Amino acid sequence: MNYTQQLKQKDSEYVWHPFTQMGVYSKEEAIIIEKGKGSYLYDTNGNKYLDGYASLWVNVHGHNNKYLNKVIKKQLNKIAHSTLLGSSNIPSIELAEKLIEITPSNLRKVFYSDTGSASVEIAIKMAYQYWKNIDREKYAKKNKFITLNHGYHGDTIGAVSVGGIKTFHKIFKDLIFENIQVESPSFYRSNYDTENEMMTAILTNIEQILIERNDEIAGFILEPLIQGATGLFVHPKGFLKEVEKLCKKYDVLLICDEVAVGFGRTGKMFACNHEDVQPDIMCLGKAITGGYLPLAATLTSKKIYNAFLSDSHGVNTFFHGHTYTGNQIVCTVALENIRLYEKRKLLSHIETTSSTLEKQLHALKRHRNVGDVRGRGLMFGVELVTDKDSKTPLEIEKVERIVRNCKENGLMIRNLENVITFVPVLSMSNKEVKTMVRIFKKAVHNILDRKC
């Protein structure tokens, strides 16, 4: 038994993988990644793969980036960690200042955590307590959130409560709190004749809910522009701005979950920037450290922050925090990550590669099994169907065979049900983007076009 075989045996014996049916996984030939460089991952057998899912939508400047490596090593020579509870540290202060500089101008305070789910959990608790701190009696019933159907905000209980993907969430229905779910503005599978008709109907319904149940609603949480985990649903232009207007009109806090779509993924630094939206609370994660280490942040306004201030420790205090909140190493690499965006003019690069990806993928719409191609920036989904008229989702077995065929030919991508997602390393070159699509196109041909 060679080294790779030994590792696979131990992996199967000891490791429980996330969002994975282990009964299936244990029977498959697992790929064990040993190292990475640039847009590529390398396994223990020496095979290399284009990272077409940015190691779960997080990698920015490529793997094994010398600049990010350098700042981590430099910080390690100073200190690895000290608590942010009752004291502070240099990297957490400098990163907070930078985050305030690059996010919407109304956001003035940064609360750190370690995962996107945690940043959402914090946002929910922050919004809920905000109303209680202002006037507990007047806002006694403000404990619900408007959410979008098919939304995904993480896997902790609060985040699941504001989610809307049955596959992930239905098993926990007895544990979660009630939310007010509204229709997602996703046109491809809607029953509307036009996007405008769909958007008008959904916004009208949202406004009616805000009028009728205003005393219950603490906030409106959504993934701005693109709903990721449900299959990359892209919202119509103007939807986010209209939601912001309604939230302001009816005095409801707007929470934008930018964990997946933030840091250039949609072509602008943040998805909110596309429509000049200023949320009351913004959640950040994933790409915040360039794909190196776990860090998240929940940003909010002075108005909300001030509601938590008191001269007495036990009054209005936000009792939330994690052991490694504001850790020096992760804050250091996050700060360097943001500096590299600016130094390398990454948003301009994404504008070019995004155009290439969009053109390459839209060319596939001629295929009889490609029902829809949707996305923005470097975040696209290809929905596979049995035929274009019925829009019946392609059998999952065939979709998974396409994904496996891509891996066999040197491309790591993943599917969300019948949607193949393309969320590559943000610094991926134009040539690599074309290679990624070419491998996928070949896989589609191998699985769907060849007669057995």
From Swiss-Prot:
Q: What class of enzyme is it?
A: transferase
The yes or no answer to whether the keyword S-adenosyl-L-methionine is present is: yes
GO CC terms for this protein?
cytoplasm
Q: Which residues bind pyridoxal 5'-phosphate?
A: G116, S117, D257
Predominant location category: cytoplasm
Q: Which Pfam families does UniProt cross-reference here?
A: Aminotran_3
Q: Which residues bind substrate?
A: Y152, K286, G321, R414
Q: Which cofactor does it need?
A: pyridoxal 5'-phosphate
Q: Which GO terms describe its molecular function?
A: adenosylmethionine-8-amino-7-oxononanoate transaminase activity; pyridoxal phosphate binding
Gene Ontology biological process terms in this record: biotin biosynthetic process
Q: What's the EC number here?
A: 2.6.1.62
Family under the similarity heading: Belongs to the class-III pyridoxal-phosphate-dependent aminotransferase family. BioA subfamily.
Subunit note? Homodimer.
Job description of the protein: Catalyzes the transfer of the alpha-amino group from S-adenosyl-L-methionine (SAM) to 7-keto-8-aminopelargonic acid (KAPA) to form 7,8-diaminopelargonic acid (DAPA). It is the only aminotransferase known to utilize SAM as an amino donor.
Give the protein name, as stated in the record. Adenosylmethionine-8-amino-7-oxononanoate aminotransferase
Gene source species: Staphylococcus aureus (strain NCTC 8325 / PS 47)
